[in-house]
Amino acid sequence: MNSPLAPVGVFDSGVGGLTVARAIIDQLPDEDIVYVGDTGNGPYGPLTIPEIRAHALAIGDDLVGRGVKALVIACNSASSACLRDARERYQVPVVEVILPAVRRAVAATRNGRIGVIGTRATITSHAYQDAFAAARDTEITAVACPRFVDFVERGVTSGRQVLGLAQGYLEPLQRAEVDTLVLGCTHYPLLSGLIQLAMGENVTLVSSAEETAKEVVRVLTEIDLLRPHDAPPATRIFEATGDPEAFTKLAARFLGPVLGGVQPVHPSRIH
């Protein structure tokens, strides 16, 4: 039986999942969090589904083995590649980023035309398209925006170059007259201002990060594992499988003073 004092485990292929960690911290400030950014193997978008599944489950094994009370797959590519395997494999709740965002988009749309942007792996997996299939009277337009992740990982989230890239990627969504757009990659909220500018103010952006954090709140409440308010102050541990210094520089933009330090993950621990 898991303890309410156990941490919530969160992982992503890099820094993008920190948008989810930030949202969880904002909504559940008392919770301990252990975050692993798989920068040594990411970004996952260009990888094959079997490669993504192998990397994601290795990190999931590590976090569950360390006693987390819930596992958050804070990566759309990993959610689409290994969610079923993870839920069969682990005896803790597994929260992913796709279905929470889909529910919010269906509730938000006014004309039934919904856009989804994500990595090539996420879009070609049809995970979002399949998740929307149960929603009546919706028309889905999905577009891969692979270079967005590269810009975010380099810390470039504004400027003419990335705006021009966004306008090119998003043009099919404008032609489809979508009124709701799912940011189907946890890196993309860092580009939300630029994406909103390109799409226009009448388009509602749905952040998978915010909706996933709400799902974590719901799940922990349902199984009575919320950390008590009178527990010791929350601790947050951030780890990277790649260069911790490079991770820290980028992560500070997501978390600010909440970040603290970033610890390296020895390759022998995740295999």
Curated annotation (Swiss-Prot):
Pathway named in the protein's UniProt entry: Cell wall biogenesis; peptidoglycan biosynthesis
GO molecular function: DNA topoisomerase type II (double strand cut, ATP-hydrolyzing) inhibitor activity; glutamate racemase activity
Gene name, Swiss-Prot/TrEMBL: murI
Biological processes, Gene Ontology terms: cell wall organization; peptidoglycan biosynthetic process; regulation of cell shape
Lineage, uppermost ranks: Bacteria, Bacillati, Actinomycetota, Actinomycetes, Mycobacteriales
Family: Belongs to the aspartate/glutamate racemases family.
Role summary: Provides the (R)-glutamate required for cell wall biosynthesis.
Keyword field contains Isomerase: yes
InterPro entries for this protein: Asp/Glu/hydantoin_racemase, Asp/Glu_race, Asp/Glu_racemase_AS_1, Asp/Glu_racemase_AS_2, Glu_race
Catalytic activity field: L-glutamate = D-glutamate
HAMAP family: Glu_racemase (MF_00258)
Binding positions (substrate): D12, S13, Y44, G45, N76, S77, T186, H187
E.C. numbers: 5.1.1.3
Pfam family, one: Asp_Glu_race
Name under which the protein is recorded: Glutamate racemase
Nuclease listed as a keyword: no
Recorded superkingdom: Bacteria
Keywords: Cell shape, Cell wall biogenesis/degradation, Isomerase, Peptidoglycan synthesis
GO cellular component, one term: plasma membrane
Active-site residues, record numbering mapped to chain: C75, C185
